Structure formats: structure tokens, C-alpha cells
Amino acid sequence: MATTERKPLLLDFEKPLAELANRIDQIRQLAEENGVDVSGEIRKLETRAMQLREEIFSTLSPSQRLQVARHPRRPSTLDYIQAISDEWMELHGDRCGGDDPALIGGVARLGGKPVVILGHQKGRDTKDNIARNFGMATPGGYRKAMRLMEHANKFSMPILTFIDTPGALPTVVAERQGAGEAIAYNLREMFSLDVPIICTVIGEGGSGGALGIGVGDRLLMFEHSVYTVATPEACAAILWKDASKSPQAAVALKIVSHDLKNLGIIDQILPEPTGGAHSDPLTAATTLKQALLDNLDELDRLTSQERRQLRYDKFRKIGVFTEVAH
């Protein structure tokens, strides 16, 4: 995982932090130029900056969490794979003539145990994002994912999926190639696999594109990730014909981790470093690795039949509600 120093990319709600950081730099520079000791004042300002960061990130709105989830420097699937696993080997091709770079997968070792890892992969710059379709997988990508999952099932290797996509690729070509069928096939087949499956939302979890690799025994989610049936912008455009109402849509859609945990859709929230996973990728990766190891240890104690039944029951409960008679 890259740790090189780069100029931070600030989100709009982080501007007060930037102003305070600039003030600290100015005071430090003036003190050096004039030979004045202002270390006490700087310590106070740095403490205030830490407190302000914690205040801001503990009270984020759903639309602000969405900005964090979409941060260009948020750790990607490949970042996490490189940070948490050993002996990673990427496997290519859907065996139908394609190899979608937006959905990657391969074999690795996690804690010394062989696993199959797959996930959506966004780009790090404009050129890379275009090449990877901004993490929006084609039908071939989902077929490649299914091929790797069948490989995992054959050789009794647990499956780890990392979800980070606004949705499946929404093009005419993708529809002609059977986008709906490819995702539906994955949904059906993932329920029948014998091996443990752990799915983690590391950034955006959007629509059927997320579900295509999202059926598992456990569904984990980073604190500032989002998981939704449609992007708030799309929802606002559909319901109100006005994409500017996406903040209201984000609230109504219940896209954030604590809402989804309360609704029983996700199983565990992974805490992020203050400032988001992009502010301290190694700490985020350590949290993810430990959560995966803990959950794998629990799932390994179950028989394949027990896992399949629990997996089925988990998803059957989603969306159940109680109707109150008037």
C-alpha cells in the first residue's frame, strides 16, 4: 500500500481543518524567522485541530459520508490485498474472451491460509479510471468472478470479496452481453457454495453491481462506506427530477453503516481512522485483516450445510417488516 507523502485532497466539510493547519504553518514560519518560541501555542492549536477533526468526522451526514467513500485516495481492493495478504497472484479472464479490469481476483494467503480474493477496482487517476470503467464491472467481470469462486469452492478455499462500485456498467453493450443474467447467476450460485464467504464494503456499494459479489455468510462494512440500492443522485433524479436533492435522498435511502446495521443488512461495522481510511490506510488495513481472520475462524467451525442454511436465512430476513393494524 502506497504511503508516499502527497498533498491532501480536501472535502468541502474539511475546510475548517485546512484553515487551522494553514494558521499553524504561518505561526511556525513566523516564529522561525523571528527566533521566537511559540511551541506552547502550536501545541494548543494542534490539539484543537485533532479535536475539530474528531468532531467533524463523528457527525457526518449521509451525503458527507458518501464523499468520504468516494475519496480518490481511499484504499482500493488492490491496496488492501497488498497490505493484508501474502503470495498474491492475480488470475485473469472469464473464459469467454474477456478480462474485465474493473473486477479483479486471484489467490493469496491470509494468515497463512489459502483464500480467493476478488473485488471491484477503481483507478487512481483519470486514465486509470477510464481503463477500469470507474469500478463498474461488465458482465464478463461477474463471469470472471464466478469462475474464481467456483475454483475456490473446488479447492476448499474461503472467498473474500471487496465491494467498491457505483453499480454495474450501464451501457447498451453491457445489456446486450447479459448484465442482468450475469449478476443473477452469481446471486443464485453464491448461495450454493460450500466454502465460507465474507463480503466487505470498502467504499461504495451500489445497486446490483455490488450484489453481484455480495452474497456471503458475513457482510462487513467500513464505517464511512455506503451501501445502497441506487446512488442518491440517481434516486433524486428519479423521484424529484432534481439531482440537487441527493442529500435528502441519501438520508431516505439509509445508506450509511449504522443504519444498515440497525436494519440487519450488515453484520459488522469496521471503524476507520479519524479522517477516513485514506488518512491512515495501514491502520484501516490492519482493522480489516483482523476482522476477516476473526470471522473466518468462526465460520470454519460450522459445517458447509450449516453455512449455506445461515447464508440463506440471512438474506431471507432482509426487508421483512411488521405491519401494524389500525
Swiss-Prot record:
Disulfide bonds: none annotated. It comes from the Bacteria. It holds the Pfam family ACCA. Pathway: Lipid metabolism; malonyl-CoA biosynthesis; malonyl-CoA from acetyl-CoA: step 1/1. Keywords: ATP-binding, Cytoplasm, Fatty acid biosynthesis, Fatty acid metabolism, Lipid biosynthesis, Lipid metabolism, Nucleotide-binding, Transferase. Residues 44-298 form the CoA carboxyltransferase C-terminal domain. Its EC number is 2.1.3.15. It is an enzyme of class 2 (transferase). It catalyses: N(6)-carboxybiotinyl-L-lysyl-[protein] + acetyl-CoA = N(6)-biotinyl-L-lysyl-[protein] + malonyl-CoA. It is found in: Cytoplasm. One of its GO terms (molecular function) is acetyl-CoA carboxylase activity. One of its GO terms (cellular component) is acetyl-CoA carboxylase complex. GO terms for biological process: fatty acid biosynthetic process; malonyl-CoA biosynthetic process. NCBIfam families: accA (TIGR00513), AccA_sub (NF041504), PRK05724.1 (NF004344). HAMAP family: AcetylCoA_CT_alpha (MF_00823). Acetyl-CoA carboxylase is a heterohexamer composed of biotin carboxyl carrier protein (AccB), biotin carboxylase (AccC) and two subunits each of ACCase subunit alpha (AccA) and ACCase subunit beta (AccD). Belongs to the AccA family. Component of the acetyl coenzyme A carboxylase (ACC) complex. First, biotin carboxylase catalyzes the carboxylation of biotin on its carrier protein (BCCP) and then the CO(2) group is transferred by the carboxyltransferase to acetyl-CoA to form malonyl-CoA. This is Acetyl-coenzyme A carboxylase carboxyl transferase subunit alpha. It comes from Nostoc sp. (strain PCC 7120 / SAG 25.82 / UTEX 2576).
